[in-house]
Design a protein with these regions (language model features):
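Bacterial N-terminal signal peptides that target proteins for export
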Residues: 1-11
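Bacterial N-terminal signal peptides
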Residues: 10-19
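Sec/Tat signal peptide C-region and signal peptidase I cleavage site
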Residues: 20-26
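Cap/insert and terminal regions of metallo-dependent hydrolase folds
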Residues: 200-204, 210-215, 221-321, 325-326
Length: 331
C-alpha cells in the first residue's frame, strides 16, 4: 500500500513539474499562463498610411473574462477579429488613440458588421476630441446601407441607436468590473506650430485588469507622461518607427517623387518628431520598469520583413523581454 502511495505521489509531482514547465515556456513566449483572465491579441501590426499584404493596420483587442475591448481599428480590423474567432456582435467597447486613418479606417466597417450581427446593445467608442464626430460620420456613411437592410426586414433597430462616440480627456476614462483604462496625452502631435498647435490630441492608454497591466503607447514621440503611465506594466505595446525605412519605401513606390518639397519636409518632421525610435523605446521601458516590450505599428522595411535587428537595438537599452508583434499574435 505504501509503495502504491509513493508511486501516486511521484506521479503527481511529475505532472506538476511538467505543468509548471509548460507554463514557464508559455510565459517566455509572451503568452500568459492558462489561469490568467486577460488576453491580448495584436490584430494589426503595420504602420500607416500604406497597405501591406502581410499585416493589417493598427488594431488590438484585450479580452478580460470573455469581454472584448478593442484598441484602435485600422484597415483590416474586422477581418482580423473574425480570424481571431471573435464574434463582431460581441464587441461593445472601442478605444481610439488618435484620428490618423491607419488607426480608424476600419472603424466604420467594424461598426456596420457588428450591427449586421443583430447587435442592439450600445457600442461605445472612446477617444480624443472629435471621436463623437468620427462615430457620427461613420454612422452617416453606412446610413444608406442600413436603411435598405431595415426596408428588407432584416433589421429593425436603426444603426444610430447602437453606436455612441465619447470625447475624453486625460485621466481614468473608463472602468467596469474587469478593467480600468487611464489615458494621457502623448507627443505625437506636439511638433505642430501655428494654427494647428494644440488642436489635435493623441493618447496613450493604460489597461489595468485583475491580473495584468497593459500599456499602449499609440503613436508618440518621446514623452515623460507616457513613461509615467507605463510604470510597472506587464506589457508595453510600443509603436515602432523608422524614418529612413519609411522614406525609402515612399521612394520605391513613387510617392516621394510626387510630393512637393514642403510635403517631403512635413512627412520627415512628423516621422522623426512624432514617433519614437528604437533607442527611445528601450530607454522608456527601462525607466518605466516594464516587464516585456511588444514592438508593433511596424514601418515597412525595404527588401526584408526581418525586424530582429530592431528588437536587438531596443535590448541595448532594456534588459527585459522584447517581442516583435505579428498579426493575430496572442499574449
Amino acid at each position: 500500500m505504501q509503495n502504491r502511495s509513493s508511486l501516486l505521489l511521484t506521479t503527481l509531482i511529475s505532472i506538476s513539474v511538467i505543468s509548471l514547465s509548460h507554463e514557464s515556456m508559455a510565459q517566455s513566449r509572451g503568452v500568459p499562463s492558462p489561469k490568467a483572465v486577460t488576453r491580448l491579441i495584436t490584430l494589426g501590426t503595420a504602420s500607416g498610411p500604406s497597405t501591406r499584404p502581410d499585416r493589417a493596420q493598427s488594431s488590438n483587442v484585450v479580452t478580460v473574462n470573455g469581454t472584448h475591448y478593442v484598441v484602435d481599428a485600422g484597415d483590416g480590423a474586422a477581418r482580423r477579429l473574425a480570424e481571431a474567432g471573435i464574434d463582431l456582435g460581441e464587441i461593445g467597447i472601442i478605444f481610439v488613440t488618435h484620428h490618423h486613418d491607419d488607426h480608424t479606417a476600419g472603424l466604420g466597417t467594424l461598426m456596420s458588421l457588428a450591427w449586421d450581427r443583430q447587435r442592439t446593445k450600445p457600442i461605445h467608442v472612446y477617444g480624443p476630441p472629435r471621436t463623437e464626430e468620427l462615430v457620427k460620420a461613420a454612422v452617416q456613411y453606412f446610413a444608406i446601407s442600413a436603411e435598405i437592410r431595415i426596408a428588407d426586414g432584416g433589421r429593425t433597430v436603426p444603426i444610430a441607436q447602437v453606436f455612441f462616440g465619447h470625447d475624453v480627456g486625460s485621466g481614468v476614462i473608463y472602468q467596469d468590473a474587469n478593467i480600468k483604462v487611464t489615458a494621457v496625452e502623448n507627443s505625437h502631435f506636439a511638433f505642430h506650430d501655428g494654427p494647428a498647435s494644440g488642436k489635435y490630441k493623441s493618447y496613450s492608454y493604460r489597461f489595468e485588469t485583475p491580473d495584468r497591466v497593459i500599456v499602449f503607447t499609440g503613436d508618440t514621440g518621446t514623452s515623460d507622461a507616457v513613461t509615467e503611465l507605463a510604470k510597472g506594466a506587464d506589457l508595453l505595446v510600443a509603436e515602432t518607427s523608422s524614418s529612413e525605412d519609411r522614406k525609402q519605401a515612399m521612394i520605391n513606390d513613387g510617392r516621394w517623387q510626387a510630393m512637393t518639397p514642403s510635403e517631403q519636409a512635413g512627412i520627415m518632421r512628423q516621422a522623426t518628431q512624432g514617433h519614437m525610435n528604437l533607442v527611445d523605446i528601450g530607454k522608456m521601458a527601462t525607466r518605466a520598469n516594464v516587464k516585456t516590450v511588444v514592438l508593433s505599428h511596424l514601418t515597412q522595411r525595404v527588401g526584408t520583413d526581418d525586424y530582429t535587428p530592431w528588437a536587438e537595438e531596443v535590448k541595448k537599452h532594456f534588459s527585459g523581454q522584447v517581442l516583435i508583434a505579428k498579426d493575430l499574435m496572442r499574449f
